[in-house]
A protein has these predicted regions:
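Acidic-glycine-rich active-site phosphate/pyrophosphate-binding loop
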Residues: 1-6, 26-27, 53, 57, ...
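A glycine/threonine-rich phosphate-anchoring loop and its flanking beta-alpha core
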Residues: 1-41, 135-143
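Short alpha-helical scaffolding segments that buttress acidic/His motifs in well-ordered protein cores
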Residues: 29-33, 76-84, 118-122, 163, ...
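Glycine-rich phosphate/diphosphate-binding loops and the adjacent beta-loop-alpha structural elements
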Residues: 35-89, 100-103
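Glycine-rich phosphate/pyrophosphate-binding beta-alpha loops
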Residues: 81-114, 195-199
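Gly/Pro-rich interdomain helix-loop hinge
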Residues: 105-183
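Short, amphipathic C-terminal "tail helix"
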Residues: 181-209
Length: 209
């Protein structure tokens, strides 16, 4: 189903608790990063990702620590909208490819799972595309790092490090908190291979990554 009109009203999010603000915000961040490096990326989705990423960087912490700051809520609402437009047209990647099975197997908030997985998937993808000589995707990860950190000369890995720090600051619970153990990893990996989101990942990932 597709709506004729979508009304995005940031004022409706002012009462959202900090923990839900954090996890939904991290989901929005993942939905901006994954389409930007997706195998199905395109210029129009690039543009909306470039609009949304710096807004998350500027506003998510504030929206969590000062929930009534309307300008932060406005920025996050726009970033979330941009992520929705991007994923609908360019797909996602391994973060959401893993998050779907994990959410189905355990009682875990989707945004929390995405936030925990995001930096590790970014690091794995960066290493994989570097090994494959995919300079364009590597350049895109470096651009993500610039958009998130505000620093002009940064490595692709700096974006993943920035996300990891953010997730820690927002006190997102680890996957173990929902009951997942190392023994469950093989089942998650097997199910993730059937996830449509995996088709958008910029490169195949080995099972042991």
């Amino acid at each position: 189903m597709l709506p004729r009109v979508a009304l995005i009203d940031p004022e409706l999010t002012l009462s959202l608790p900090p923990d839900i603000t954090a996890t939904t915000g991290l989901d929005a961040l993942a939905q901006l990063i994954e389409p930007f490096v997706s195998a199905k990326r395109q210029p129009l989705t690039d543009a909306v990702c470039r609009t949304g990423l710096p807004r998350v960087a500027e506003a998510l912490r504030t929206a969590c620590t000062d929930p009534t700051r309307l300008e932060a809520r406005e920025a996050m609402s726009l970033a979330s909208l941009c992520g929705g437009l991007a994923l609908a047209n360019a797909g996602l990647g391994a973060v959401h490819g893993f998050a779907g099975p994990i959410g189905g197997m355990f009682s875990a908030a989707h945004g929390a799972v995405c936030g925990i997985l995001l930096p590790g998937v970014m690091e794995a993808n960066i290493a994989a595309v570097r090994d494959r000589g995919d300079t364009e995707t590597l350049r895109r990860y470096a651009e993500i790092a610039r958009l998130l950190t505000g620093v002009a000369d940064v490595s692709p890995e700096a974006g993943a490090a920035w996300v990891r720090t953010l997730v820690a600051e927002l006190a997102v619970p680890p996957l173990a908190a929902c009951g997942m153990t190392p023994a469950d990893i093989s089942a998650v990996v097997a199910k993730s291979k059937q996830a449509s989101s995996m088709k958008g990942n910029p490169c195949p990932l080995a099972d042991d990554v």
